[in-house]
């Protein structure tokens, strides 16, 4: 029962983080940031769909749910706050650039996490095909 409660909590947190990403979307004007945010939302929704139906996959993305996605949200919230403050000194411009360079890397990392959810299935199917072909003498 405890595992089920933990799984439900993880899924709830994932859904909350995705919702927070969507809220950030409405407050960003930079097209490059918006594009990366949109891709991050889409891949996060795909991860959610996969782990919602397979608790074994959910275990593979705990760090993503507990740390990576919340960190991206915090970075975006601060980016929005600083952009709204209209501070454009040298340090802030460097920070904006760093954040803008970070977002595509975060997306690529999330994409790898999503892809890794299918690794064992790919190996299983490949093994089944090899065994069947061997048994058929092919």
Q: What residues fall within each predicted segment?
A:
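Membrane-proximal, non-transmembrane interface segments of integral membrane proteins
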Residues: 1-52
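Soluble C-terminal extramembrane regulatory/interaction domains of multi-pass membrane proteins
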Residues: 35-138
